[in-house]
Amino acid sequence: MPLASRVTLGAGCYWGTDKFIVKDFQKRFPGSVKNASVGFMSPDPNAMKNPSYRQVCSGSTGHVEVLDLELTDPQAHYEELIRFFYMFHDPTTKNRQGNDMGSQYSSYIFTYDQEQSKVASRVTKELQDHISRGTLNSFESETVKTKIGDATVYYKAMQEHQDYLASNPNGYCNHYFRFKSWPKA
């Protein structure tokens, strides 16, 4: 069954998520990403409609800061993207990435079809197995807390937040590579 081409990921502050995927993931897989933007999505389909950045940052809306993108070839790149997603943020912290705290900084994989959900769950289990075996020990705790759930409504963030680190190379980013390549099984 074919995978959906749309992908929405929460990995803490969306500026770093955008930079690591749009720039760094595409270094590994040139031309793999198109139509990327940062914004907000809530796991709750009944969450506040069209929240502002300030409202999301208050932690009261239930929205997660996300990168929303389209893959040119989801069959070839979705699984690699999910692995890459786990390489540059800490999926073992709940509602936090570094100094950024609050539910808006959750580690979250929003899925658009059953195949995406299966792949995301399998890769997440692989990561947990590597952590449990001690193959990977670059995270704060030993339990993956990333949530996987159905995508809901995406709200694009204000224009000045789009491509932020490309325009402000010295801007705030707490993401970094915790490991450089996915361990062998």
Question: What is each PLM-predicted segment?
Answer:
Residues M1-A185:
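Flexible coil/turn and secondary-structure edge motifs
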